[in-house]
Each structure stands twice: as C-alpha cells, then as structure tokens.
C-alpha cells in the first residue's frame, strides 16, 4: 500500500522540532509494519488555500495520504492528523492529540496503530513494549524498550544469569528465571502500580523458561527437566511430564488448553504438544535439533515459532500445532533465536548474531521485512508486551 506522509504544517507558523517528530515516528512505524510503501511527499504542493491536490498525489502513485497540522502553546502540542483515500478523495480517519513534548512519540504510535487497523484490519502494535535481557555471562539484567528500540529502561539489578522473560497478556507482570540466589529460580516482576519483584521458587533445583498462561491464572516452567504448572504465587506446582527425558521451554496455546514444549525423549530435542494437564503428548517436528518454541497468541494465526539448529547456524521456523505447514523464516545469517510473537500474532521479535554481535530484530510472520531494533550487542531473550 503506497502511503504518502508529508511533514506536519504549523498552524501558528512557528517551527517546533518535537512536534515534527510525530511524522518521523509515524513513517518509521509504517515502514516497520512491512505492509506499506512510505513516501515523504516532498515536491507535491498544496494549493494556495491549503486544501489537498489529490490529483497531484494520485499522479505520484499515492494510494493513501496522511495530512497533519500542529500548534504549540503553553508547553503543550496539539496535533491533528487525517488519513485519506487518494483515488476516492475520501476522508477515512481523523485523530486529534494534545501532548507534552515527551509524549509526541506515543501519540504518533497511537495514530500509526489506527491507520494500520483502518487499512489492513490488523491491530497496530506500535504502542507495545519489548522486554529483553542485556549483558553477557553472569552479568545480565532485564530491560524494557518501545517496540522500535527507543526509550530503553532498566528493570532489574540482578547482575546474574537472568534468562527467558515472559510478559503476562495484560502487560503488567513479567516472569523470568535468575540465579541471583544460588540456583536458577523463577521470579515475577510487577510493573504496576510500582515495580516490585517476588521470588516464586526456592528449591536448589534448575527452574527456568517460565511462561504465563493466556488468562494469567497459571505459570508453566521447567524444573530439573520436567514441565511444571503452578499458581501465580508459586503454590500448587504440578509435574505434567514425569519423564526420564529432558523436557523444557513450555509455551501455552491461545486458549490455555495445550502446551508446546521441547523434549529429547526421541533422542534429540524436538517440539511436542500436550494437553495442559499433561495428557495426549504428541511430537510435531522432525528436524535435527529443534528448540525454543513460542505459540502465537492469536488463533487466527495459530502457529508455533521455534528454532532449528543447523550446523553453526540457528534459524527460526513456524509450524502449525498439528505438525503441518512448516516454514523457514530466517536463513544464512548467524544464529537466530528466542522468537516471541507480537500481541496480535502478526509479527515476531527475535535475537540474532547475523552482524556479529547479538541484537534484537523484528519481522513479519512470514519472515519478510526483518529489521534490527538494537545495534550495540549483548541483547537476548526478547519478549513482546502490550
């Protein structure tokens, strides 16, 4: 979809760089979606009255046009933006925002999400967050950033082997594992009303790869090579697998009725699916070494992303829960690991060493439009949050 996004027009005539950031963020959001061909519309004039010369935009190849204006007053910025269908010369969508200079990016993300919903029917993810691990070895901590890699904030001070964060479906809590106190244990970090951390497991065992159930009522995790499910406070833990094999990395289906996980019960690690009570276990992959599953939160997509180790490389695949329709999303580019789905199930964030250092990337669910979010290395285990 060809979208032209001219700079905002100042109503009062004065230039405000923070207000102009709105368009920069908006253009970047639409590019990151991978569904739009975005243009800045330079050289296409408005007529003298300030109305839109639709014919000029149509001749330039525009299908959609976003036009906006702003006014700065008293330390606040008022922004009005509209989406037009160029061929029909039709007003499709309009939004107005009043923001402090520090909130202009948030307003742009909100408008980009509204535009994406209007043009594609897909909920925009531009106001979402990505939580990730930064650091190496025994000096790792949890951070949060905007989905586009901006506004990075540190969440923990563990300086330990911190691994596998996962956000609750409402985005208010993060579960992860850390060896901050002796062995790997499960922790929960609450983000509202304030940042508060609780340790859920306390045994001298290997507790890792936790994940919230979709309704937030349970946490699945692995302990010493078995899959367990507990209440959010760590009580009532139940062993689902009781297997002599190593079973790790549980991930819930969108309705919470099934769990996919990794097991080497067949000789090498493969992806299996079972009911959430541990019954009806079946294998769904047959590659050489498959691990790190992540089930899409959207039944409309209903795919499981996973990692297949292929020699010195590791690549991300998707597969249907019944073991059909396997697709390779990354190829020939280092180690691609830790896939995590966007809340709408149409995008995947992941970690990759394709350029040497390990950084966070995003891509569309079919593997197209792979784009880096970080560039300074030492980043791993991204998890998408609302």
Give the residues covered by each predicted segment.
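Hydrophobic beta-strand positions that form the internal "hydrophobic ladder"
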Residues: 130, 174, 216-219, 259-260, ...
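Blade-level signature of beta-propeller repeat domains, shared across WD40, Kelch, NHL, RCC1
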Residues: 357-386
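A flexible loop/linker signature enriched in serine peptidases of the S9 family
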Residues: 123, 134-141, 157-160, 177-186, ...
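Conserved beta-strand position repeated across blades of beta-propeller domains
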Residues: 166, 211, 251, 294-296, ...
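Short loop/turn segments that connect beta-strands within beta-propeller blades
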Residues: 87, 146-150, 190-194, 231-235, ...
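Short beta-strand->alpha-helix linker/helix-N-cap micro-motif
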Residues: 1-56, 66-70
């Amino acid at each position: 979809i060809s979208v032209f996004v001219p700079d905002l027009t100042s109503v009062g005539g004065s230039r405000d760089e923070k207000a102009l950031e709105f368009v920069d963020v908006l253009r970047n959001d639409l590019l990151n979606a991978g569904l739009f061909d975005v243009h800045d519309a330079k050289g296409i004039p408005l007529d003298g009255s300030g109305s839109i010369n639709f014919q000029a935009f149509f001749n330039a190849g525009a299908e959609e046009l976003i036009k906006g204006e702003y006014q700065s007053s008293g330390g606040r910025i008022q922004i009005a933006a509209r989406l037009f269908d160029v061929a029909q010369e039709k007003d499709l969508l309009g939004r107005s925002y009043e923001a402090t200079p520090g909130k202009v990016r948030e307003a742009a993300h909100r408008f980009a999400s509204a535009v994406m919903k209007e043009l594609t029917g897909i909920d925009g993810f531009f106001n979402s967050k990505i939580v990730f691990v930064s650091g190496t070895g025994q000096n790792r901590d949890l951070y949060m950033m905007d989905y586009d890699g901006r506004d990075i904030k540190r969440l923990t001070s563990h300086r330990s082997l911190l691994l596998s964060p996962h956000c609750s479906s409402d985005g208010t809590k993060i579960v992860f594992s850390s060896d901050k106190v002796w062995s790997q244990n499960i922790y929960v970090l609450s983000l509202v009303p304030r940042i508060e951390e609780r340790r859920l497991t306390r045994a001298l065992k290997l507790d890792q790869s936790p994940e919230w159930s979709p309704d937030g009522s349970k946490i699945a995790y692995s302990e010493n090579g078995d899959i367990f499910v507990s209440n959010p406070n760590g009580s009532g833990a139940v062993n689902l697998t009781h297997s002599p094999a190593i079973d790790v990395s549980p991930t819930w289906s969108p309705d919470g009725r099934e769990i996919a996980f990794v097991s080497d019960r067949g000789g090498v690690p493969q992806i299996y699916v079972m009911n959430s009570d541990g019954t009806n276990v079946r294998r769904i992959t047959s590659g050489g070494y498959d691990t790190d599953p992540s089930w899409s939160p959207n039944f409309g997509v209903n795919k499981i992303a996973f990692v297949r180790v292929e020699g010195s490389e590791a690549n991300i695949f998707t597969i249907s829960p019944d073991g059909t329709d396997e697709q390779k999303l990354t190829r020939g580019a280092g180690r691609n690991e830790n896939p995590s789905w966007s809340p709408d199930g149409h995008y995947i964030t992941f970690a990759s060493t394709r350029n040497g250092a390990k950084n966070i990337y995003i891509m569309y669910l079919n593997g197209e439009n792979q784009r880096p979010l970080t560039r300074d290395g030492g980043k791993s285990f991204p998890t998408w949050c609302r």
